[in-house]
Amino acid sequence: MDEYRELISVLPLDTVEYAFAYGSGAIQQKDENKAEKMVDFVVVTKDAQEFHKANIAKNPQHYSLLRLLGPKMLEKIQCNFAARVYYNTHVNVGKRKIKYGIISYENVKQDLLDWRWIYISGRLHKPVLDVIKPKDDMCDLVTENRRSALHSALLLLPESFTLKQLFHQIVGLSYTGDFRMIVGEDKNKIMKIVEGNYEELMRVYEPLMNDDARLSVMSPAKVIQDGSTTAIYHRLNLLPSEVLNQIQKNMNKAQKRQRDAEEVIFSLAHRHDVAATVETAIGGIIRPISFSQTAKNAFSAGMTRSVIYSLAKMSKFLKSK
């Protein structure tokens, strides 16, 4: 942990509420050497403009030529497009390379509670390293986000399954509809995360499973959930608002009717295509964001860094085929 704190200490941290490291450079994945990987960070700030102002003064080399636009314009680029994250990538700190994304507290709150973009919220479905510890309000947001991930995964599973199957669904949620899983990402990524982080996933999700009255963990090989219409209706109602909005929009469009969310959810709970409907809704949020945020990342990184990063991703993809 000290290594990661040292890496992020090059940034101005006065406005930072929370920072975590994620990805294969910080969290062990099966058959991967994390010491060789670039370390990914997310930094949550209460004042994006002030963060960029201080960071440009301290670390101008972290930015592309966009820094010349000034901190006010960088804040606008960050907070008004795609998943509301601004990334600096391929930054050299000592012997390691880091990439860090900056997001405002208000935007991360929106993503964790409502799944507005399923971007930072998706990264926090999985185990991360808390480099700057979150305060109580942020802890509550992260827990609620993971509870939503558990409900979503359970709606995609049958009445009986294994813990490994559950974790596979949870980890896979944020890749649903992501075009990078077709081109640019390791095809075995989800499996590697689950295999390399089983104990951490258990630590994160066991308390949430214990709190769920409609779920029984008999053993790692046998988990049973209540598959009644009442239980499904209950879980559907606990999904984040953006997922419910997508479900309502998709079902009304398919049936050429205009019904309110409550009526749509009640109807869905009685159908046999709940899993497919929920998965389609989640993918409908992630798909456009995966395109727009990738384009934004390339824009903020500049041409040279974007080409280097894309080539590294493509190499990883080809090795996994």
Curated annotation (Swiss-Prot):
GO BP terms in the entry: cardiolipin biosynthetic process; CDP-diacylglycerol biosynthetic process
Q: Name one GO cellular component term.
A: mitochondrial inner membrane
Q: What is its EC number?
A: 2.7.7.41
Question: Which pathway?
Answer: Phospholipid metabolism; CDP-diacylglycerol biosynthesis; CDP-diacylglycerol from sn-glycerol 3-phosphate: step 3/3
InterPro entries, A to Z: Tam41 (IPR015222)
Q: Which UniProt keywords apply?
A: Lipid biosynthesis, Lipid metabolism, Magnesium, Membrane, Mitochondrion, Mitochondrion inner membrane, Nucleotidyltransferase, Phospholipid biosynthesis, Phospholipid metabolism, Transferase
How, per the record, is the cofactor bound? Magnesium. Also active with cobalt or copper.
Q: Where in the cell is it found?
A: Mitochondrion inner membrane
**Catalyses which reaction?**
a 1,2-diacyl-sn-glycero-3-phosphate + CTP + H(+) = a CDP-1,2-diacyl-sn-glycerol + diphosphate
Judging by the UniProt lineage, the source's domain of life is Eukaryota
One Gene Ontology molecular-function label = phosphatidate cytidylyltransferase activity
- The enzyme class is transferase
Q: How does it sit in the membrane?
A: Peripheral membrane protein
Q: Which cofactor does it need?
A: Mg(2+); Co(2+); Cu(2+)
Keyword match Magnesium: yes
Q: What does this protein do?
A: Catalyzes the formation of CDP-diacylglycerol (CDP-DAG) from phosphatidic acid (PA) in the mitochondrial inner membrane. Required for the biosynthesis of the dimeric phospholipid cardiolipin, which stabilizes supercomplexes of the mitochondrial respiratory chain in the mitochondrial inner membrane.
PANTHER family on file: PHOSPHATIDATE CYTIDYLYLTRANSFERASE, MITOCHONDRIAL
What the record says about family reads: Belongs to the TAM41 family.
Please give the name of this protein: Phosphatidate cytidylyltransferase, mitochondrial
